[in-house]
Amino acid sequence: MPGTNLTREEARQRATLLTVDSYEIDLDLTGAQEGGTYRSVTTVRFDVAEGGGESFIDLVAPTVHEVTLNGDALDTAEVFQDSRIALPGLLPGRNILRVVADCAYTNTGEGLHRFVDPVDDQAYLYTQFEVPDARRVFASFEQPDLKATFQFTVKAPEGWTVISNSPTPEPKDNVWEFEPTPRISSYVTALIVGPYHSVHSVYEKDGQSVPLGIYCRPSLAEHLDADAIFEVTRQGFDWFQEKFDYAYPFKKYDQLFVPEFNAGAMENAGAVTIRDQYVFRSKVTDAAYEVRAATILHELAHMWFGDLVTMEWWNDLWLNESFATYAEAACQAAAPGSKWPHSWTTFANQMKTWAYRQDQLPSTHPIMADISDLDDVLVNFDGITYAKGASVLKQLVAYVGEEAFFKGVQAYFKRHAFGNTRLSDLLGALEETSGRDLKTWSKAWLETAGINVLRPEIETDADGVITSFAIRQEAPALPAGAKGEPTLRPHRIAIGAYDLDGAGKLVRGDRVELDVDGELTAVPQLVGKARPAVLLLNDDDLSYAKVRLDEQSLAVVTEHLGDFTESLPRALCWASAWDMTRDAELATRDYLALVLSGIGKESDIGVVQSLHRQVKLAIDQYAAPTAREALLTRWTEATLAHLRAAEAGSDHQLAWARAFAATARTPEQLDLLDALLDGTQTIEGLAVDTELRWAFVQRLAAVGRFGGSEIAAEYERDKTAAGERHAATARAARPTEAAKAEAWESVVESDKLPNAVQEAVIAGFVQTDQRELLAAYTERYFEALKDVWASRSHEMAQQIAVGLYPAVQVSQDTLDRTDAWLASAEPNAALRRLVSESRSGIERALRAQAADAAAAE
């Protein structure tokens, strides 16, 4: 990326020299409907350490008109370059800087994003500043430890709404003058501007009153279930304020559902932005509502952990995200009135799976990553930073005890409110409340990479009584290219003993909790007891480790996986089977057989939908190529059978309809999709609504049944932003050279597409059953990649680098071509990481394909 980086050392030096007091930011957005640029005027007051010196402030702008430092005009041609304005001759004590610039609206989801809704032709704006993009809107010292107050003044078109971190004032002559914020970091400031629809309420408890707002575009207003969102929000307020013993720290709490958002949501202080796909236009399963609720709670937790108390530098990003990820699940599991008390099942099913995958890539890194610059942090929003970190926090809670954990957190908030911290500050507070020395624990869990494997070693006598039980811990070699050494870690785990009852259900009859440390840990608590049908290590999912079953337990689970009475042990066994498949320990054909034998009894809809995705991935990537079509046929026939057998109108019925649409292939199956679309056939209870229609259309386009005219006709039914994206996916999915060339040109050779449409085109372009058609693009990908990375914003370049990598071409040739590019292209560290991660997927797929082929012999 050209000239826009910032190193940790530069940030450290700047923080040593400067203390920032306040920003006054004046933006003229009256031309937002037309786009282009807008006037940005920033006044910053800051103090300089004794002796004075020189520094710089960050700004990304097409034009800088004025830079005035302490009343002296600086030559903009001399001081402004790339993303920095040099500040020479700083005086000890108070300095005042004024910068006048023209900043640009974006369509990449970075900085001030501008979107025009095709329904009403109105522009909608919102900011996204994490990590370094406040500098795209106003001149800022773009690092988290230079906190300040921020006072925004915004001029906007008449009839629009302007939302920021502070309560929204009454406009005067279409000018909104907000009161200053508390001291916060620049990356959690925000502006959301446009003719948004809103619903308002108040959170009230024990004399506290916090205004609540929910916003979306008017074209989504009919779908906005504000009452449900407010309900989850209030539960979060109740639970977090009790657990944290610290009142919500801002004056109001708005949640704004915004278009073309790159992430799930963003924790702007008091003004959380959330992707508007969470305003559901069509029927979704309860799993989607659970994920939305988790997102709401995640961002609310950040108001304390991240906004009130903020990391000093981005190497502690993991603590921000891990804590919020842990807190969302803990709140859903324990908050009174929660609709998702099984949230730890979802955590095991989704977050842990993400973490285990990320931790086995060549880019694996310690949870506490070494973040040397902005390029490092931009690719570090990964499964280790979020999911492994949250898993390890769950382990820490088990290790120190829940009461001690939250007492430590309470002390941490009180001690560091509106300040910046390091990991040692939190660990110190937890050591005080728990009495445990956490230095050794931290070194093993936070400062090393990789994942352990836990295996049971069991001996029984002739009567089936356990005579010896131990847990063997392994530390597999780290992936090639990863830094560090394999590490054995201390684990606090539970062991569950399960037997079949008279109804054929697997019921837990005993539970042992213990510390596992070193290579072999004896478990005397189980010696002398009758051997149960299943012994499950890491029951209750307290620790972070791969778990393997002993031979007898595996045999019982293979036959009775769906018979566990509780969802969490089922999820743990499903996860173990999937992990074994990815590790080439279980053949894809055997994994499919296991899923087909147990999925019909799986009640957790989130687990069912994960199994759908995993089976498709396994067949597409991990099956022996000669067996792939037969396995796809078997799976698709099963999806149709389950669709027809599912309870009418149920979540399971909808999930099976989507799974069927994803792989429908025979003329009869495709005829059924077509007939469900035009209404000549129906399945009782199945509403073929807008989103399901698009799933059917996209599949019919991908197999060549539908062309441009059918896609255009469907778009006429749904002339919305979502419809535009779905149509783009369908057009790119068509199995023709012309369709692929058009899609490729629009993404790689042009930079005109907005972020969400580019993502949609990439999703359609890559079809796993179009390998031959896509083969020619392997070489074109490598030829274009460096130029794309150099010329696009980070978000847009990453979409292309990851999304268009030839992952469907599972072959040694793809590995060789990737290696040749890595050796010759000299990519920077961030791009090298992304390509190396994709390469790792090819290696894993080749191993799994070999294992599947061997199982057929």
Swiss-Prot record:
Q: Which InterPro entries match?
A: Aminopeptidase_N-like_N (IPR045357), Aminopeptidase_N-like_N_sf (IPR042097), ERAP1-like_C_dom (IPR024571), Pept_M1_aminopeptidase (IPR012778), Peptidase_M1 (IPR001930), Peptidase_M1_aminopeptidases (IPR050344), Peptidase_M1_dom (IPR014782), Peptidase_M4/M1_CTD_sf (IPR027268)
Q: Which residues act catalytically here? A: E299
Locate the site labelled Transition state stabilizer.
Answer: Y386
Assembly state and interactors?
A: Monomer.
Q: Keywords in UniProt for this one?
A: Aminopeptidase, Cytoplasm, Hydrolase, Metal-binding, Metalloprotease, Protease, Zinc
- Record GO biological process: peptide catabolic process; proteolysis
Family stated for the protein in its record: Belongs to the peptidase M1 family.
- Please tell me the species this chain comes from: Streptomyces lividans
* Catalysis performed (reactions): Release of an N-terminal amino acid, Xaa-|-Yaa- from a peptide, amide or arylamide. Xaa is preferably Ala, but may be most amino acids including Pro (slow action). When a terminal hydrophobic residue is followed by a prolyl residue, the two may be released as an intact Xaa-Pro dipeptide
Full protein name: Aminopeptidase N
Q: Which residues are listed for Zn(2+) binding in this entry?
A: H298, H302, E321
Primary localization: cytoplasm
How would you classify this enzyme at the top EC level?
Answer: hydrolase
